[in-house]
């Protein structure tokens, strides 16, 4: 578990985390509304696509795809999904072929996913302070 005391610390932590990701990784991001899931994803995407990449939250259209030189990043937001099967209408099977997948609000579809999965859990401690834990295959994942 890591205590992130500011937005800057969260940004740096997400950048370090991104350095450990590769194609075929599936990252599940969980936390209450406003915990920083999209913020965390934004830093991961910038790591691979460049800091000037225009990153749009997938909250309303459920999916944003970003291209890197070697793979795509599929950024899903499941907050408004009513049925787990809806993920297949969003190109999920295609996403599984050598791409990096980021899924916010993943609880509704987690049972459909095949391990290994990387789970990022963010908890609000106060205004800009967060508690972050990362698990991979039921083990705490510490890359620092």
Swiss-Prot record:
This is tRNA threonylcarbamoyladenosine biosynthesis protein TsaE. Mg(2+) binds at residues 38, 104. GO terms for biological process: tRNA threonylcarbamoyladenosine modification. It comes from Rickettsia typhi (strain ATCC VR-144 / Wilmington). InterPro entries: P-loop_NTPase, T6A_TsaE. The keyword ATP-binding applies. Belongs to the TsaE family. It is found in: Cytoplasm. The gene is tsaE.
